[in-house]
Amino acid sequence: MAEVEKLKQLQLQREALKKRGEQKVKETEKKRTEESVQSVCPECGSRQLVHDYERAELVCQNCGLVLDEEFIDRGPEWRAFDHDQRMKRSRVGAPMTFTIHDKGLSTMIDWRNRDSYGRAISSKNRAQLYRLRKWQRRIRVSNATERNLAFALSELDRMASALGLPRNVRETAAVVYRDAVDKNLIRGRSIEGVAAAALYAACRQCSVPRTLDEIAEVSRVSRKEIGRTYRFISRELGLKLLPTSPIDYVPRFCSGLNLKGEVQSRAVEILRQAGERELTSGRGPTGVAAAAIYISSILGGERRTQREVAEVAGVTEVTIRNRYKELAEKLDIEIIL
């Protein structure tokens, strides 16, 4: 019983630290927002601003204008030359993240049986430490909501890893799922379905598009359920998502076909011209992107067959034939097959 009381006290301390940490994060975010007001170059209007830490300057990457100088380096005062050295000298934990149910603000008892000085724990105290560690794992997920989040976020991470999605997409998906939980949109729906729909919405928000078929392949629910749940949560959460642009698919498809940068640039230009003439309206973005890449590969001397392009893009050869003929005719592109 004494051990349980200790663990309850630890949990109360953990919750107090968690609240203090969240308040600190809010203050830091507010400060960062105030500091980043000047996020547009006054000379050329570009948003591509880069911090040059060697010269302590904020430089526009487009025109080279120095917007700020002698800014404060908020990094650590120590230097490290490899990963092990960095881990030894670091005095803080990982940053806050929405992809963990407790946002990464909780603590845990280390699995190595050593004290704070690095000395081995005596055999007499190891049994007690084992019990404390077991109870610590149990109380870390204390209620049904946290259990729901823990399972859903692990499912999100699994699907994102299978699709090779970057960190910002995972964070956005976790935020969308948390909002759905807060508004009680999970009731009557499967956790996997809502998680997959949140991931699909995050991909669209971050301009890293994935099709419903691709999401369905790595999830445990059907494409139909993902689409239905996605429409529901986007309506209830008020997500304002623009239609997916075919241009967003070009880099991934070109990489899958091992095409050079010139072919990719030409495909993007073809799609821009098609967009200006409204040739992409009402058509699937993957099919239009695949057709533009097919045309570009022929013009660039790196011909890929319609079957190869169709396999990478996840569309049929008939779709590519119809779209590429339409693009070639409307844009006056002469193709020699």
From Swiss-Prot:
Write down a Pfam family by its short name: Zn_Ribbon_TF
Q: Which positions does the entry assign to sequence repeats?
A: 154-237, 248-329
Per its UniProt record, what PANTHER family does this chain match?
TRANSCRIPTION INITIATION FACTOR IIB (PTHR11618:SF13), TRANSCRIPTION INITIATION FACTOR IIB-RELATED (PTHR11618)
Q: Which species?
A: Methanoculleus marisnigri (strain ATCC 35101 / DSM 1498 / JR1)
Q: What is this protein called?
A: Transcription initiation factor IIB
GO molecular function ontology, one term from the record: zinc ion binding
- NCBIfam families named in the record: PRK00423.1 (NF001658)
Q: Identify the gene encoding this protein.
A: tfb
Q: What UniProt keywords are attached to this protein's entry?
A: Metal-binding, Repeat, Transcription, Transcription regulation, Zinc, Zinc-finger
